[in-house]
Amino acid sequence: MKRPLLFVTLVASLMFFATPVNAQSFGVRAGASANPDQFFFGGHYETRPLMEHLTFRPNIEVGFGDDVTLVAFNIEFAYWIDLKNKPWKVYLGGGPAANLYDSDSETDLQGGFNLMVGAQHRGGLFGEFKVGLIDSPDVKFTVGYAFK
């Protein structure tokens, strides 16, 4: 791993330890993406609602495979939809992404945008599907756990 990639990854990971006092939760995630074809893992934190049903849910995902390492810094918002009398909530959202691609020949920072839909159980388990635009991975399938 090259020094710039290691430095950016280290600095970005510090944001998870400096969560604001009003942070509602944080979580872990893992999954698979297409184009590049990778397995990834990461983490997120989520604020209390900024307005009714809308939260800020930034995350970092580190992917390996397809002869490239990808560190994705996703600045995403989620709009939550309550399912009456059900233990699950559905969310829709998206936001911009800064994608750091590192291959044998070069390191490149590219902008992207994600659209997502997901469902989260009140116990914390969640599943998420993302579609990437511009220079984000084409699709991502994610499972994870949000700690409360």
State where each predicted segment sits.
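Bacterial N-terminal signal peptides that target proteins for export
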Residues: 1-8
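Sec/Tat signal peptide C-region and signal peptidase I cleavage site
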Residues: 17-23
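Residue-level detector of the transmembrane beta-barrel scaffold of outer-membrane proteins
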Residues: 25-29, 55-59, 89-93, 126-128, ...
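Membrane-embedded beta-strand positions in outer-membrane beta-barrel channels/transporters
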Residues: 27, 40-44, 74-76, 91, ...
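Solvent-exposed loop/turn segments connecting transmembrane beta-strands
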Residues: 29-41, 62-71, 100-109, 129-142
